[in-house]
Amino acid sequence: MLSQAKNGASIVGEWLTKPPAPCLYDRQLVWITLSLMITGLVIVTSASVPVATRLTGIPFYFALRHAFFLVCSLVIIAGVVQVPLSRWKQFSVPMLFLSIVLLIIVLLIGRSVNGAARWIPLGIFNLQPAEVAKLSLFIFLAGYLVRQYSQVRASFIGFIKPLAVLGVLAFLLLMQPDLGSFVVMFVTTVGMLFIAGAKLWQFLVMISGALLGIGLLIVFEPYRLRRVTSFLDPWEDPFGSGYQLTQSLMAFGRGELMGQGLGNSIQKLEYLPEAHTDFVFAVLGEELGLIGVTVVLLLIFALVFKALFIGRKCLQSGQLFGGFLACGFSFWFAFQTLVNVGAAIGMVPTKGLTLPLISYGGSSLFIMATAVGILLRIDHEQRLFAKYGPAESEELDDSGLNDSNNNDEQE
């Protein structure tokens, strides 16, 4: 039995790390992304019917919107994968400034939901600037680490500069308030600096300061303190501050091993708030059980592993910008998943973060799709670099992804 498990694990590992040689894009990454998107559409459709019926009278209102968002996301991936990495590096600073402007705008005219002003109405969907800020920060940080690589490794000044940028974004995010997005940005920034080779004592100072700051933010903000206390013992107040978590835990309890079956969730009947957004994982657990939960988590793990694997290949070949950015994306996907799943099962306080590529929400899907498109582009350019060398790969980059694939097929 153990040998069979090892053989199965080795087959999966080989599938993830050794795609067909003639291919100049990562097929496995495409299939993993499509699998997560389709899973998200199915679960969002099931989880959103009761609330959609009450709010709009159209049972599949949110499901149809989510399907539209998915189609747009696929178009975004197809477009982004054509953009050379040099363009993202070139425009990383303007993108960061645009994110700061959007974060200021949302404080002035943003739409408030549950006491947090996080969305800018744009007609067909509500833009969440925090999602744009995540992507912009990680692209900017990857470019900074390339430009100041030796300084980051040698001096505290090089280490502290990106934290100053993060501090500006943190201030604007906490004004909304959106502590969850800040925590994701902070952890991803720490991970990227670690990959770049910053000193250990610098991390200890930064993490200690961050923990102290987050603790003060929780203590001096009543609603955050209620979230933490309800997370520690939700059953103490199951109809008040602990209501959402207790309903989520009951959903997992009902799911057991095999689940209740698609469409058979009880908690989605408006017992569990935000069933199709922040707590879609609980509905998934109730309807598909432990087996379904495990499959979805393995898919997300495969996505994280792919990003990390692509980043490692780039760093080994000297393509630092793509390497740092791919590793940053892997930390982002992993930690945001950890927080979302942890909140649903009571391991961490509720943070209002979506489950990557699964939860309902246009902004989250579009930004995650952009990140996947950039990952595909990073992998594509790394393969060109490995196959043709630096000079020839740059010439092929200028002709676009499709031309490169056509040339490869002719060979």
From Swiss-Prot:
Primary location class: membrane
Q: Residue spans with biased composition (Acidic residues)?
A: 392-411
- Could you name the Gene Ontology cellular component terms for this entry? cell division site; plasma membrane
**Pathway listed:** Cell wall biogenesis; peptidoglycan biosynthesis
Identify the InterPro entries for this entry: Cell_cycle_FtsW-rel_CS, FtsW, FtsW/RodA
Reaction(s) catalysed by this chain's protein: [GlcNAc-(1->4)-Mur2Ac(oyl-L-Ala-gamma-D-Glu-L-Lys-D-Ala-D-Ala)](n)-di-trans,octa-cis-undecaprenyl diphosphate + beta-D-GlcNAc-(1->4)-Mur2Ac(oyl-L-Ala-gamma-D-Glu-L-Lys-D-Ala-D-Ala)-di-trans,octa-cis-undecaprenyl diphosphate = [GlcNAc-(1->4)-Mur2Ac(oyl-L-Ala-gamma-D-Glu-L-Lys-D-Ala-D-Ala)](n+1)-di-trans,octa-cis-undecaprenyl diphosphate + di-trans,octa-cis-undecaprenyl diphosphate + H(+)
What Pfam families does its record include?
FTSW_RODA_SPOVE
Query: Membrane topology type, per the record?
Result: Multi-pass membrane protein
Where does this one sit in the cell?
Cell inner membrane
Region Disordered: what ranges? Answer: 391-411
For side Periplasmic, which residue ranges?
50-65, 111-121, 176-177, 221-289, 342-354
Gene Ontology molecular function = lipid-linked peptidoglycan transporter activity; peptidoglycan glycosyltransferase activity
Residues on the membrane's Cytoplasmic side span: 1-28, 87-89, 143-154, 199, 311-320, 376-411
Provide the transmembrane region boundaries: 29-49, 66-86, 90-110, 122-142, 155-175, 178-198, 200-220, 290-310, 321-341, 355-375
EC number, UniProt record: 2.4.99.28
Keywords from UniProt, A to Z, are: Cell cycle, Cell division, Cell inner membrane, Cell membrane, Cell shape, Cell wall biogenesis/degradation, Glycosyltransferase, Membrane, Peptidoglycan synthesis, Transferase, Transmembrane, Transmembrane helix
Q: Which GO terms describe its biological process?
A: cell wall organization; FtsZ-dependent cytokinesis; peptidoglycan biosynthetic process; regulation of cell shape
Family as reported in the entry's similarity comment:
Belongs to the SEDS family. FtsW subfamily.
Its protein name is Probable peptidoglycan glycosyltransferase FtsW
Organism placement in taxonomy:
Bacteria, Pseudomonadati, Pseudomonadota, Gammaproteobacteria, Vibrionales
